[in-house]
């Protein structure tokens, strides 16, 4: 029977470490790490996402500020706000909630954010650093995927990994992180020929295609680890709906372990976003040191230990 990798338990462990580190940071420097979230327009889903991110940051002791701009905000006004936040030494992380209104070039906006404050990891500088293994801020969902994966496979060297999904937000960054950890990586899309056969040879499958139940049980070999990033709402016969992943999880009991949906990668995403805020603040304060690539601990414990699979306690 496959083990369930609990993102909820892993997120709780990460947030506990963050709370202690934020308290130490605040004691040493006399101020808490500060996040500024920028929200343009009145999209209900965006408001919910921003509220959750701010609540999580405040929960661990960080300062969080929200800038709300009208839906008819000009690109020039938004860029001017970002420029002012870039110059403000009291601001350690900047998050611009996507999507943006049609009159605003999202790429131009993201490129304007100071890469040292780009907690989403979308700036070209951070993308380059990730691709070359030279550090930089890592997108939060891929980071969460790696923490959960390392909880059951501490040593990834030599593993065959398949990533289904080519997005700049999840698929490509996850592939880069897997490569850096020594995996042989195949990146696929929903329309890749012989996708089932490709997956059957994989030790690790990361499903991030946005297609409900794309990965069937016969695609997964015995003993594989499956990370399900998909969040899809499907209609039920009684008129209600439910959230499902990209993997038919009821068919993969022969896998070694998998992340459930909900309760898997989702809870880790916001927790890892908070970790990026803290890392950005440390860099600005010149008080952090890296214990290994993509490690987030001052003392060699905490987030670095989570990433390496130690003391996670996430498998049930």
From Swiss-Prot:
**What is the top-level taxon of the source organism?**
Bacteria
- List positions binding NADP(+): 165-167, 231
Pathway participation: One-carbon metabolism; tetrahydrofolate interconversion
Gene3D superfamilies, per this entry? Leucine Dehydrogenase, chain A, domain 1, NAD(P)-binding Rossmann-like Domain
Key word Amino-acid biosynthesis present: yes
UniProt cross-references to InterPro entries, sorted A to Z: Aminoacid_DH-like_N_sf, NAD(P)-bd_dom_sf, THF_DH/CycHdrlase, THF_DH/CycHdrlase_cat_dom, THF_DH/CycHdrlase_CS, THF_DH/CycHdrlase_NAD-bd_dom
For this UniProt record, give its keywords in alphabetical order, as a comma-separated list.
Amino-acid biosynthesis, Histidine biosynthesis, Hydrolase, Methionine biosynthesis, Multifunctional enzyme, NADP, One-carbon metabolism, Oxidoreductase, Purine biosynthesis
Q: Name one GO cellular component term.
A: cytosol
Q: Which GO terms describe its molecular function?
A: methenyltetrahydrofolate cyclohydrolase activity; methylenetetrahydrofolate dehydrogenase (NADP+) activity
Q: Which GO terms describe its biological process?
A: L-histidine biosynthetic process; methionine biosynthetic process; purine nucleotide biosynthetic process; tetrahydrofolate interconversion
Keyword Signal applies:
no
**NCBIfam families linked to this entry:** PRK14188.1 (NF010785)
- Entry similarity comment: Belongs to the tetrahydrofolate dehydrogenase/cyclohydrolase family.
Protein's name in the database: Bifunctional protein FolD
Q: Which organism is it from?
A: Sphingobium chlorophenolicum
């Amino acid at each position: 029977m496959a083990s369930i990798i609990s993102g909820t338990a892993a997120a709780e462990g990460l947030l506990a470490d963050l709370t202690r580190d934020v308290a130490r940071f605040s004691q040493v420097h006399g101020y808490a790490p500060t996040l500024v979230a920028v929200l343009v327009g009145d999209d209900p889903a965006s408001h919910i996402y921003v509220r959750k991110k701010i609540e999580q940051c405040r929960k661990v002791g960080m300062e969080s500020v929200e800038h709300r701009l009208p839906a008819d905000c000009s690109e020039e006004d938004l860029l001017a706000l970002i420029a002012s936040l870039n110059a403000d030494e009291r601001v350690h992380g900047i998050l611009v909630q996507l999507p943006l209104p049609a009159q605003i070039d999202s790429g131009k906006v993201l490129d304007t954010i100071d890469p040292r404050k780009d907690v989403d990891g979308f700036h070209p500088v951070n993308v380059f650093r990730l691709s070359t293994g030279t550090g930089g801020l890592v997108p939060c969902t891929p980071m969460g995927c790696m923490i959960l994966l390392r909880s059951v496979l501490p040593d990834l060297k030599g593993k065959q990994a398949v990533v289904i999904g080519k997005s700049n937000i999840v698929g490509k960054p996850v592939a880069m992180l897997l490569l850096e950890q020594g995996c042989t990586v195949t990146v696929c899309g929903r329309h890749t020929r012989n996708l089932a056969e490709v997956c059957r040879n994989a030790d690790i499958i990361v499903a991030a295609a946005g297609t409900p139940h794309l990965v069937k049980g016969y695609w997964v070999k015995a003993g594989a680890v499956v990370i399900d990033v998909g969040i899809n709402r499907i209609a039920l016969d009684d008129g209600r709906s439910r959230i499902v992943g990209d993997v038919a999880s009821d068919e993969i009991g022969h896998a070694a372990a998998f992340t459930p949906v909900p309760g898997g990668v989702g809870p880790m995403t916001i927790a890892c976003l908070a970790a990026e805020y803290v890392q950005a603040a440390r860099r600005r304060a010149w008080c952090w040191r890296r214990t290994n690539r993509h490690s987030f601990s001052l003392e060699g414990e905490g987030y670095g230990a989570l990433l390496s699979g130690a003391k996670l306690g996430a498998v049930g």
